Amino acid sequence: MTQGLDVDGARLERGRYDLWVGTEPIDVARVAAALEDESLGGVALFLGRVRSPNDGQVVSHLDYEGYDAMILATMASLADEARTAYGGTDGRLLVAIHHRLGRVRPGEVSMAVAVAAAHRAAALAACAVVVEEAKRRLPIWKLEVGDGGARYVAGAAVAGEVL
């Protein structure tokens, strides 16, 4: 695969993963296509959407900010760690992580994580851990704007297993 800039945002593809960050809407079909491998029978997909209300406040939108190169490097680390932990003895695990930057409105997808593994248990476990670690480690800041004003909010990672 190749490394380079997409029309919008940055994309890094390196054999076993597909990573993207940009301001255009996330293409869920493209995320799923990155996992096409008939030898892998378990596929797990997580879509994170902006919600409203949040903490009792109506949300107009979230403004996501981040540094593309640093985000992609962190995504690559997450994908490599997942492959090591859940890819079995042959490392057979495909990972796609896409995150949107800029203005994202309620109902729109801000993050997609998908994992394909030989079996469903590994795919589901790896997907869950990548989502939680992405929320914790990606250098992305989000400004929530709504009827209560604007405030920076932290990613709500759930305490649990770490890669």
Predicted regions located by residue number:
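N-terminal, polar/charged subdomain of small-to-medium soluble alpha/beta proteins
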Residues: 1-109, 116, 124-128, 132-163
